[in-house]
Amino acid sequence: MNSAWFKKALPHIIAIGIFLIVSVIFCKPALDSSQTLQQSDITQFQGMSHQLLERQKEKGEGALWMTNMFSGMPSYQVSYPAAWSPVNLFHDIFTLYLPKPINFFFLMCISMYFLLLVLKCRPWTAIIRALAFAFCSYTPIALSAGHDTKIFTLGYVPATLAAMVLIFDKKYLWGFTLTALFTAMQLGMNHQQINFYFFIIAAILTAAYLINWIRQKQLAHAGKALGLLVIAATIGVGVNVLNLWVNADYTKSSKRGGMLVMDKKDNKDKSPVENSRTVGLQKDYAFQWSYGRMESFSLMFPGITGYGSYYSSKDGEQHLFPKLTDNSNVYKQSVKTLTKLISEKNNVPEVQAEAQAESQAENFTLGV
């Protein structure tokens, strides 16, 4: 009995071992206590939260208001002592208490591996595909920028989808339990943009199964599956309801709740306006954090629109990578466009703006 169980579990044990070894090797500098991963957003967060953390040390309790951001704002939007949550416990278990950034890659590996197994992929092919998912070029780019919550949220997406598929495949108990768990985990990582994209995928997946059930006249199963899915999702949301509620309320007073329009020129993309405020975030601003049109092809062809300009530091020396050569298309196009514009205008800001428009420049975010 034990021998049969071990034989069945062996491929999965090997898979976890491979994911752990590859993640550790890829993030080997993290094992050196003298080296620290430099993340711009995390550095900014440390600066923003410094006043709050110092007061917390002095008074022994967190402050509800901070004065060093935007002339004052609620502190829970930056840093506030959070109450204990089962999400934190399960997150540590799923990441094996691994140090940063090893834990990011390991989580993404096991989550995608779980989804692939549920989709009936063989363990050996699932290992390769899970590694491809976790170590795609976007992951280290996002981590270098400090988008920790984004990567953790993205890491739980495959697991949540897998749990949904279990419900749809009539494995009700496991599907319901894991859907509630992974919904709570995913929302608990607190990156609502990724959750928004997940809901689109989940809706398409559910619609596809529903159409198939209707065709096969499995209406009883459809009703049971959808009912369990709604209840499980409600439990997952309920675990995080406090955080979601206060953020939704604060959004109304933030830029994402609409921008004040004093002049028609302020509303460049002609967003709907109510009570002198735009409805939601302006499209031009929101899409600055998306891949550019050609940049999306970097998923298959790395460096198709050039590379970023991040650098690493070691032994006091900075190393810029990769080098932009005189023969690169990005360099040639930039020189051509700027030379033409500078010869026509003397206004530097105007030259910069037109250079971006005329050369069809990609967004400022990296997507190698």
Locate predicted features.
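Start-transfer (signal-anchor) and selected internal transmembrane alpha helices
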Residues: 1-27, 224-233
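Membrane-embedded helix bundles of polyisoprenyl
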Residues: 19, 109-118, 124-213, 225-247
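Polar, glycine-rich mid-to-C-terminal structural blocks
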Residues: 224-291
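Transmembrane helix-loop junctions in multipass membrane proteins, especially transporters and channels
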Residues: 27, 31-35, 170, 191, ...
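Juxtamembrane helix-loop transition sites at the ends of transmembrane segments
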Residues: 44, 81, 157, 208, ...
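Aromatic-residue-lined binding/catalytic grooves and analogous aromatic/hydrophobic interfacial grooves
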Residues: 221
